[in-house]
């Protein structure tokens, strides 16, 4: 049984989260807190497996409460955030301070019963993932923080006009907003490849995600926009709610195209992005699949490898959730399997082959 403590100042939200969580017979809500002070006291008393944490609460906000729970190593914390730009900035601050991951608040933008079921499934799945990691999250976080390199200022902006000869197509999901910092900040600014990243997240969260990632990286990080000409030494991040596609124009330039066809469970989809990159770059594609639930991108890793490209999958040793990389490995789509703290090294080696 997974024991969960809910923290939210809204009685309606506490009730809604309780109903969602207890629809799973293996989850038990052991208590609820209405402010930051209350959740810290109850977390110490109940010793739950997971805490769901609202950000904006009276007396003591969720960010402050989070730091107490993380520093005392009580349990993983799942942030429950409003789907706004302001909510996104605070949520990414929480992830940097040690939160496990985040989910959008149920209600609000949910417009149908099918949407509600999708939101409920995401919350339950992330609670399950957090609970599985209760005893090893702290160890991994200590290791990750210890190995994280100092932020290096960008040495030089990308030089427009350079030909793009190789591409790195990266996919990540659950745990990704935090763990991606073990990879992309280590990529040098002179890397001779364009980089693409799909991270499953709500539309309003992408600008804040890109802003914080860009501040931590040596390479330029920008949100993928329709019509942008692709340059080497730049990381293009797929927008929430839009698929990231590539096309070649008549001049031979690689251009970004966006679409929002509801033909995949996730939008943006790792598979859509990887297949599009493969179509343009063929055997000069490097596929990278990291932590995440499900199998988005697994078949595309197989296709990249069969086309002569290089594929890198995160190992079970470091994966928050081994679903996506594990599926790629099972299908024979991973040439290289390493923990996340070695992925940047393997990307650089692959580009330089």
UniProtKB/Swiss-Prot annotation:
Involved in chemotaxis. Part of a chemotaxis signal transduction system that modulates chemotaxis in response to various stimuli. Catalyzes the demethylation of specific methylglutamate residues introduced into the chemoreceptors (methyl-accepting chemotaxis proteins or MCP) by CheR. Also mediates the irreversible deamidation of specific glutamine residues to glutamic acid. InterPro entries: CheB-like (IPR008248), CheB_C (IPR035909), CheY-like_superfamily (IPR011006), Sig_transdc_resp-reg_Me-estase (IPR000673), Sig_transdc_resp-reg_receiver (IPR001789). Residues 158-353 form the CheB-type methylesterase domain. The modification 4-aspartylphosphate is found at residue 54. It holds the Pfam family Response_reg. GO terms for molecular function: phosphorelay response regulator activity; protein-glutamate methylesterase activity; protein-glutamine glutaminase activity. GO terms for cellular component: cytoplasm. CDD domains: CheB_Rec, REC_CheB-like. Contains a C-terminal catalytic domain, and an N-terminal region which modulates catalytic activity. This is Protein-glutamate methylesterase/protein-glutamine glutaminase 3. The active site is at 173, 200, 296. Its EC number is 3.1.1.61, 3.5.1.44. Its main location: cytoplasm. One of its GO terms (biological process) is chemotaxis. Phosphorylated by CheA. Phosphorylation of the N-terminal regulatory domain activates the methylesterase activity. Residues 3-120 form the Response regulatory domain. The gene is cheB3. It is found in: Cytoplasm. It catalyses: [protein]-L-glutamate 5-O-methyl ester + H2O = L-glutamyl-[protein] + methanol + H(+); L-glutaminyl-[protein] + H2O = L-glutamyl-[protein] + NH4(+). HAMAP family: CheB_chemtxs. Belongs to the CheB family.
